[in-house]
Amino acid sequence: MAGDSRNAMNQDMEIGVTPRDPKKIPKQARDYIPIATDRTRLLSEGKKPRQRYMEKSGKCNVHHGNVQETYRYLSDLFTTLVDLKWRFNLLVFTMVYTITWLFFGFIWWLIAYIRGDLDHVGDREWIPCVENLSGFVSAFLFSIETETTIGYGFRVITEKCPEGIVLLLVQAILGSIVNAFMVGCMFVKISQPKKRAETLMFSNNAVISLRDEKLCLMFRVGDLRNSHIVEASIRAKLIKSRQTKEGEFIPLNQTDINVGFDTGDDRLFLVSPLIICHEINEKSPFWEMSRAQLTQEEFEVVVILEGMVEATGMTCQARSSYMDTEVLWGHRFTPVLTLEKGFYEVDYNTFHDTYETNTPSCCAKELAEMKREGRLLQYHPSPPLPGGCVGAELGAEAEQEGEEEPEGLSGSQETKDSA
């Protein structure tokens, strides 16, 4: 039956439309490599280095290639200019003004040439369109004086030149438009809140440990400035490739990670460093992930912090990510907040520090099942238990054996107490 279904599937694939360029298909889809989605793979000897989807600085490692419709960038020219690097932006700024001055300077020279003003230079009986305009250089200087409105001096337009008056109006209007566009572009680029994100910190590592008897994925965020981020909110996404039951390979699939959206804990009052907590429950993508399986999984957790800059009111966004190798199982963050005389002090020297804590090595699903069956003890600060959740089971069994005392022994003890 399996062979017949496989042959039928191959026939369907041959009949179907094949892609034009098979090189564009991901390698996993071309080779039909099955991807384990039930997290039952054995431990591998080591992981191969992988490319980050997002750098720790927040830069996305995605390159847009083979873009055919490049005209779309020109349809939103303002955003295109703002997104340019500073050296190209300054080059465009200089070229736009220079070309505008040269163009209108050529028009002023052309009017003088057609009217014959260049042939009557120095003739006091001749009334030119622009006085003291003797060539292209003087026409170029007159164009700069007109567009920048610095005031006429040696060169000035006369009343006997209607075409010059019309050109003066056109250049004044177009010059104002160019000024508004280019100065506005430079102002927006200067006032962008990207640099504000440089003072928003994320911990170098994320940790998984117990909090209120539940496994939680946690990371820390902080703000170095005294001016706060207004309406700060945070969200997280799991980036992980997967393969569907139909065999479709989905690279870099994005899954939401709940960091308090339903309870409002994702809205932050970021005055001091905060630990963001994701409770690993039935809806969590880490529900069936144990400590051993964490060492073989390949994923990336992207965290995004958004808010408005208090000084400018502009929206600011800071991003970071945690690879699977940057998630520490059985660790907690070192406290950074201390109470001083009259104020709280934050020690950023220990912002990224963690310490080991007693945490079961089993997945959250097994931990919840053991808790429902009553086989799990309360975890207190102590050396790590061996064998994941096995230590917790042994401790629970020992406690049950201690509670089951013989009736004769308990009765003799009561007799001694009464005596």
Curated annotation (Swiss-Prot):
Intramembrane segments of this protein: 136-147, 148-154
Domain of life: Eukaryota
Modulation of this protein's activity: Heteromultimer composed of KCNJ3/GIRK1 and KCNJ5/GIRK4 is activated by phosphatidylinositol 4,5 biphosphate (PtdIns(4,5)P2).
Topology Extracellular: residue spans: 112-135, 155-163
One of the GO biological process terms: regulation of heart rate by cardiac conduction
Keywords: Ion channel, Ion transport, Membrane, Phosphoprotein, Potassium, Potassium transport, Transmembrane, Transmembrane helix, Transport, Voltage-gated channel
Site, as annotated: Role in the control of polyamine-mediated channel gating and in the blocking by intracellular magnesium: 179
PANTHER family: G PROTEIN-ACTIVATED INWARD RECTIFIER POTASSIUM CHANNEL 4, INWARD RECTIFIER POTASSIUM CHANNEL
Subunit structure of this chain's protein: Associates with KCNJ3/GIRK1 or KCNJ6/GIRK2 to form a G-protein-activated heteromultimer pore-forming unit. The resulting inward current is much larger.
Name of the protein this chain belongs to: G protein-activated inward rectifier potassium channel 4
